[in-house]
């Protein structure tokens, strides 16, 4: 908060009834009402408030340079009706801190210096009531373009000197300077101009012009300006400062012929179209805090969008996991395309439980590949020329065919909770044929069916190998060999517990 102090501080060099000169203050000193010149420099002021200057009706010159000022209150300068010179250079004043009312009561203002601040755009409404302004210095800011509205709507008919040097200007509208008919001096040096139209022909009073230290691209679009400049320098009353520095950028083949903007003509200009420049016109200034609010809203919207995307991905992965779990639990029942009992359907009683029936034939042997590769049941017709029973107890990674000695022909083996059980088909559906997943033909013959007695959980029906054991084809790379006879039920149980999970029944055997 700035203070209003009556006494003259020690840091003030001059304190008279007409002049007050101070430096390195953190406040605006309370100068006498008769003060005509108030200079406070190199201090630590953050803003200009209305209470600091409201009583200085006779003030003609106010200098607040190098104070770190960021904000100028809308009515801070309203009482300075006699002010002719306002120096605010080397501060942090931005375009958003100036309003249409900031300079509106300065009817006597002739010199306004806003050099080396943080201005990005210009609005003609700032200077609507400064009819007496003759010098406007805007050099050393961050201005990027001059549109037709930058000085439009102003009453700057008395403006003689305009300094826009050392900015970032890359675009100038064709009628940007038309509201300033009395301009005598224009400085556009040290900007980023590559192309611009002939904006100076309407300025009949122009006698000093600076365009050096830019990034001129000598295309044919620049030819009208080059023609104006050649005619301009023919008069001894006109001065084109640093004309030798109006060099073309070495970017095209035409540069070798032109070399300078002044030498550019229709015969040596580059016919290539220039790069397009996007010009953003500032329709209305953002109020203080609006930019922060806008960034907050955009950040929140982005966070919501990312959250929704994450939920969609998570839901998709969850559905995939459920599908894989369902597939694993019912792998036994999905192994075959049709029920293997011609009259029986797949049974899905509970989650993780399935019955899969396979009719046993004298002519059929069932082999199942159990391993790390995809399980694929193979049904092949028995060969009666099989090898001797000496190899009958060798188990090569796959189940041998199990022929039911005690339960008769037509019995069926099926899986329940990782155990091998026994059943029979209930009726004779007639002889049928079907293809398994391997493309082999399977024959189903009519058999009588005996209903399976109730079994307790974990019970396994004993099975033994018959005396005419048939040699099993080795169809799995995951093999192990044993050379001693063991019961069939033990083989089946051990192999199932090794290769099958507790939740899924992976294979059905005859």
UniProtKB/Swiss-Prot annotation:
It is found in: Membrane. Keywords: Leucine-rich repeat, Membrane, Repeat, Transmembrane, Transmembrane helix. SMART domains: LRR_TYP. LRR repeats lie at residues 34-55, 58-79, 82-102, 108-129, 132-153, 158-179, 182-203. The chain crosses the membrane at residues 294-314. GO terms for cellular component: plasma membrane. It holds the Pfam family LRR_8. It is a single-pass membrane protein. Its main location: membrane. The keyword Chaperone does not apply. InterPro entries: Leu-rich_rpt (IPR001611), Leu-rich_rpt_typical-subtyp (IPR003591), LRR_dom_sf (IPR032675), LRR_TM_domain-containing (IPR050541). Residues 214-271 form the LRRCT domain. This is Leucine-rich repeat-containing protein 53. It comes from Macaca fascicularis. The gene is LRRC53.
């Amino acid at each position: 908060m700035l203070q209003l102090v009556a006494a003259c501080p020690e840091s003030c060099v001059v304190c008279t009834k007409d002049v007050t000169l101070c430096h390195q203050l953190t406040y605006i000193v309370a100068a006498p009402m008769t003060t005509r010149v108030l200079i406070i420099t190199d201090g630590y002021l953050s803003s200009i408030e209305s209470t600091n200057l409201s009583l200085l009706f006779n003030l003609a010159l106010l200098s607040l340079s190098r104070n770190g000022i960021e904000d100028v209150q809308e009515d801070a300068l309203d009482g300075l009706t006699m002010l002719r010179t306002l120096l605010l250079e080397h501060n942090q004043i931005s375009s958003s801190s100036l309003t249409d009312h900031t300079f509106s009561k300065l009817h006597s203002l002739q010199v306004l210096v806003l050099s080396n601040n943080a201005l990005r755009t210009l609005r003609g409404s700032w200077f609507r009531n400064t009819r007496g302004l003759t010098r406007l210095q805007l050099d050393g800011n961050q201005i990027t373009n001059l549109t037709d509205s930058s000085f439009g709507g102003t009453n700057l008919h008395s403006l003689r000197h305009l300094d826009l040097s050392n900015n970032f200007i890359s675009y100038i509208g064709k009628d940007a300077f038309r509201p300033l008919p009395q301009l005598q001096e224009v400085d556009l040096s040290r900007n980023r101009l590559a192309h611009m139209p002939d904006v100076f022909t309407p300025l009949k009073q122009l006698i000093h012009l600076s365009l050096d230290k830019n990034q001129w691209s000598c295309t044919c679009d620049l030819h009208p300006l080059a023609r104006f400049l050649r005619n301009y320098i023919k008069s001894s009353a006109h001065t084109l400062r640093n004309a030798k520095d109006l060099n073309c950028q070495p970017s095209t083949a035409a540069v070798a012929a032109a070399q300078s903007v002044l030498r550019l003509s229709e015969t040596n200009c580059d016919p290539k179209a220039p790069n397009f420049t996007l010009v953003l016109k500032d329709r209305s200034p953002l109020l203080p805090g609006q930019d922060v609010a806008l960034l907050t809203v955009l950040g929140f919207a982005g966070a919501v969008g990312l959250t929704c995307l994450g939920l969609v991905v998570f839901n998709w992965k969850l559905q995939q996991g459920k599908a894989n779990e369902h597939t694993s639990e019912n792998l036994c029942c999905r192994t075959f395309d049709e029920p293997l009992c011609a009259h029986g359907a797949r049974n899905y009683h509970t989650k993780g439980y399935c019955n899969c029936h396979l009719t046993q034939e004298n002519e059929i042997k069932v082999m199942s590949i159990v391993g790390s590769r995809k399980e694929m049941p193979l049904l092949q017709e028995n060969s009666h020329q099989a090898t001797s029973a000496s190899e009958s107890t060798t188990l090569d990674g796959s189940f041998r065919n199990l022929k039911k000695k005690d339960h008769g022909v037509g019995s069926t083996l099926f899986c329940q909770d990782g155990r091998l059980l026994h059943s029979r088909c209930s009726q004779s559906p007639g002889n049928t044929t079907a293809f398994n997943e391997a493309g082999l033909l399977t024959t189903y013959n009519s058999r009588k069916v005996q209903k399976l007695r109730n079994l307790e959980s974990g019970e396994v029906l004993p099975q033994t190998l018959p005396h005419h054991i048939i040699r099993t084809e080795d169809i799995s790379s995951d093999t192990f060999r044993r050379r001693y006879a063991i019961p069939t039920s033990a083989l089946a149980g051990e192999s199932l517990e090794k290769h099958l999970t507790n939740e899924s029944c992976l294979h059905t055997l005859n």
